[in-house]
Amino acid sequence: MAEQSMGPRDFFRKEAAIADLALLACPGAEELCNLVDGHLVRWAREIGMDVDTFIIPSDCPRFQSGDAKGLVKASTRGDDIYIFVDPGNYSVTYNLFGYENHLSPDDHFQNLIRLIQAVSGRAHRISVIMPSLYGGRQHRRVSRESLDCAYALQQLRAMGVKNIITFDAHDPRVMNAVPLMSFDNVMPTYQVLKCLLHHVPDVNFSKEHFLVVSPDEGAKIGRAHV
């Protein structure tokens, strides 16, 4: 079978397009969204498209009471939307009653829900790009405990999300909670090794000088590909 390759012209081909592309970034995921947008804009300009950005401005402002709302600042009607959210980004803060609070994974997920609410019913399709899978370490029940990740995926499906894209899920079998929804688990093994070789050029991968440490039993499968 011949190797299939897709170039910018194929990616933005009108007859193959589902709808106009749009990107949304939850608080804390702006950097990743901007990087993706930069590649998309460059590809679009290579084929003569006059576009400055695919990002639709959005925000999740908070009231003095601590409540928040999702705000999308442009029309998304009929768009193919990709929403970026990073539940593991603890550097995002907000002030509440004189105290600086850091966003927890629960806060990040709730911001995602707010933005989905803001565009649902208008967008052609909604996909979520979540580098760190929300609740990914609570994927199975061994005692009287919650199943946060499975229920979160079911909640997103119920809200109209068609596709989840995540990286190196703790246990990708959690996709069984939503068998009819697309779930893409991308393994970043190549990118990790590429970055390692770039920053540590004298690294030695021989068995006498190199050791891979797995943080827990569930991570051994992912590390085996290294």
Predicted regions and their residues:
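PRPP-associated nucleotide enzymes
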Residues: 1-225
